[in-house]
């Protein structure tokens, strides 16, 4: 893992993703989580303050140890017991059908093999379980979409693969 990926990117992403508008979206996405919960791409722990009060345990995964280091304070402040795995989303060390809810917020874009990660999430989700997610994508507006395509090579460098 590069110095940028481990030390600089986590702080940059934490700053960019901690806006008030993002917090509102996080709260909405997490409002209905119950039971055994798995969060893929926990990042710097920005979701932690938005979990409902009844959540007492959470299992998380993120391949970036620098992100996980920044998440420690938010995890401690949340009072939620966390079991964390420093792994990518394509091969999760969890038993089949072991979670009632899976949380994924602005994460899929950073996973090299999205299809495999989605298969893994489905594998660990119990029958009738729910995926709570939010993701960004291409704009509806053609002009904006063109700019998104032009800026993608730069974005992938600055955002560590996103």
Positions of the model-derived regions?
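N-terminal, positively charged/glycine-rich alpha-helical extensions of SAM-dependent methyltransferases
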Residues: 1-10, 21-23
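A short acidic, Gly/Pro-enriched loop at the edge of an enzyme's catalytic core
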Residues: 90-102
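Class I SAM-dependent methyltransferase SAM/SAH-binding core
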Residues: 38-40, 44-91
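A short SAM/SAH-binding and catalytic strip from SAM-dependent methyltransferases
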Residues: 100-113
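A short glycine-rich, Lys/Arg-flanked "PGG" loop and its adjoining helix->strand segment in the class I
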Residues: 115-127
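C-terminal alpha-helical "lid/dimerization" subdomain adjacent to the S-adenosyl-L-methionine
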Residues: 6, 13-19, 132-162
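Conserved alpha-helix/loop element of class I SAM-dependent methyltransferases that forms part
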Residues: 16-36, 46
